Amino acid sequence: MPTYLTEGVILRRVDYGEADRVLTVLTREHGKIGVIARGVRKAGSRLAAHTDLFARSRMQLARGRGELDVLTQAEMVGLTAPLADARRAACAAVCAELADRVLESHHPDPETFDLVVDALRDCTDAARDPRAALVWLTRRMIDRLGYAPQLYDCASCATPLPETSAWFTAIAGGLLCDGCATSDAGVVECSVRVIKVLRVAAAGNAGLYRR
């Protein structure tokens, strides 16, 4: 079978058979792919660590006959979430699931790959709040899907919003002024701080967002 090299991060894994694992891997060059890692659940397997959730590795893969390529070699690059920290593990898991659900298979998108890797890295960084990483990734993914919410003008009447709290509604697609919020039963109040976080995330400046 022909082989190829790629860098990937594990989004999902499922035990298969007596000793194998089926992996969902997000790669920079090939997008989201399915991989089978044979024998990795056996004691002493060289590749076991490379099949951990959120692990990032340089992989050598053999083209499979079906939908799954075969993991043959791997070299760890980084990103293994500290699962002992429940909050960090939970945020990393949601980031991985978001990427898995949103991204189509075999559609390379290096920018989205970097977004996911950065979010997972922040989830493992003791100096970062993992919830902020999750909000950042969610906001950026929404933008890339074309569903960016209106954050500066009222999504209903288009009136510029003052620097005060406002009301968010998914139905209208953004923030509402006080006058329009009364007519929407599904609104959620957002504080000034939350609105600022959303606006910084929308600007796409990761360095500013992490401050």
Q: Where would I find each of the regions flagged by the language model?
A:
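Non-catalytic alpha-helical scaffolds and adjoining flexible linkers that form interface surfaces
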Residues: 1-211
